[in-house]
Amino acid sequence: MDCRIKSGNDERACHLRPYAPADEDAAIALWLVTWQATYPQFDFAGRLDWWRAHWRRLAQAAKIVVATGAGEAMIGFVTIEPHTHYLDQLVVAPDHWGKAVAAALMTEAKRLCADFIDLDVKTDNARALGFYKKHGFTVTGDGINEFSGRPIFHMRWRAGA
């Protein structure tokens, strides 16, 4: 599936495709750079062993869609578990923030789970909160992330709402 990357008056093609096991290292590297840009005060490099194990569990249970740009470099991905409708990760390279890559990945997630999608987002992640609200998600509750201990919002998108 093709998508468009927008930057001012410039538009470039991107491509959405299913994840392949050969993508693992690129996905893990992209996760690291993206989360470090979002929360520079935290040591995400120190969490790489945890993340690799988590990623491998996701790869078994979830549908993963990868966004690629020029030269087929990975610029984003979304993971969604079709049985639970849980969106675990929506990651876009910082230099592609605001350029419609996340929107294309969200559209694909909604296609894969057309009834509803649940997710958790850190309460202080204003960029993500704004994005999810723009795409029809509403806050359904709050809690604490069991890994980080940080406060989160539970959010849901429901088709037709």
Residue ranges and their predicted role:
Residues A93-D95, K99, T123-D124:
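Active-site acidic-Proline motif in GNAT/NAT acetyltransferases
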Residues M1-A22, W157, A161:
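Conserved N-terminal entry element of GNAT/NAT acetyltransferase domains
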Residues L112-D124:
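Conserved GNAT acetyl-CoA-binding A-motif
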Residues P18-D95, M106-E108, L112:
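Acetyl-CoA-dependent GNAT
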Residues M1-S7, P94, T107, L112-A114, ...:
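Intrinsically disordered, low-complexity, positively biased terminal segments
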Residues A62, G149-M155:
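Short hydrophobic/aromatic beta-strand or adjacent loop that forms the aromatic wall/cage
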Residues A103-A104, D124-G141, F147-P151:
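Conserved active-site alpha-helix within GNAT-family acetyltransferase domains
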